[in-house]
């Protein structure tokens, strides 16, 4: 989250990204989106999880300001996302797997001194830190709080295909290379089957990968209008030991 003193640096980052030929910039701040627009939009703008996209009206504002893709906030259901995509006329990115972003700050919770002087930065955020209270768990990464359970829509990919969604995200930030590789491979195969339009059933290797990389269990987030930590499904329900 840029502050006033960061704005000149934001402009330089946009220039550097354009020179490097990146596919897009993920933006979580309308001020940064304006900087990109004032520079002529040299790089496509994708609005991220902290941009407060809850309705098609908000998505429309960001579209008019230059965004070509939006990621609705975690609390937005799949039904609401479909309306948002249709009414705003903008690409919608759907989180299908991984930790759910729940909060962000520009100050690191894990450090005891300012970033520029704390010797633990940036190594400390590469470690795993959990916030626990009885039955619930959250993961802190310093400047953000993530869900403890992994979002998992493996069982529901045919619905996503039928609803017209085409942009999918696996949240692999702060995860291991094995997590990104194995979960990514499972979804690549599963999405291919789902979009083929035939019979869809989870392969053991897909569900095994989901279980193996979710030590705190699985959930569907708010996709179906339920509590965020709930899992709706039949095959992977057993991943949540306390349920």
Regions found by a protein language model. Name each.
Residues 56-57:
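Conserved nucleotide-cofactor-binding alpha/beta core module
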Residues 66-67:
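A cross-taxonomic marker for long C-terminal extensions/tails that follow the last structured domain
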Residues 1-53, 71-243:
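Active-site pocket-lining/capping segments in soluble small-molecule metabolic enzymes
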């Amino acid at each position: 989250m840029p502050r006033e003193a960061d704005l000149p640096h934001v402009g330089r980052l946009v220039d550097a990204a354009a020179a490097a030929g990146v596919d897009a910039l993920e933006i979580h701040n309308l001020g940064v989106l304006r900087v990109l627009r004032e520079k002529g939009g040299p790089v496509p703008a994708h609005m991220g999880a902290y941009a407060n996209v809850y309705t098609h009206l908000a998505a429309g504002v960001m579209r008019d300001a230059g965004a070509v893709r939006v990621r609705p906030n975690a609390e937005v259901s799949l039904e609401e996302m479909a309306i948002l995509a249709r009414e705003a006329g903008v690409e919608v990115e759907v989180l299908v797997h991984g930790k759910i972003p729940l909060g962000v700050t520009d100050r690191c919770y894990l450090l005891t001194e300012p970033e520029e002087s704390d010797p633990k930065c940036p190594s400390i955020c590469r470690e795993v830190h959990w916030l626990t209270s009885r039955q619930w768990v959250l993961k802190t990464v310093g400047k953000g709080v993530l869900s403890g359970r992994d979002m998992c829509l493996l069982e529901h990919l045919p619905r996503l295909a039928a609803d017209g969604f085409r942009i999918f995200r696996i949240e692999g930030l702060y995860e291991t290379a094995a997590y990104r590789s194995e979960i990514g491979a499972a979804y690549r195969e599963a999405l291919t089957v789902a979009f083929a339009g035939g019979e869809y059933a989870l392969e053991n290797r897909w569900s095994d990968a989901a279980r193996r990389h979710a030590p705190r269990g699985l959930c569907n987030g708010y996709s179906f209008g339920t509590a965020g930590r709930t899992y709706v499904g039949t095959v992977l329900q057993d991943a949540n030991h306390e349920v």
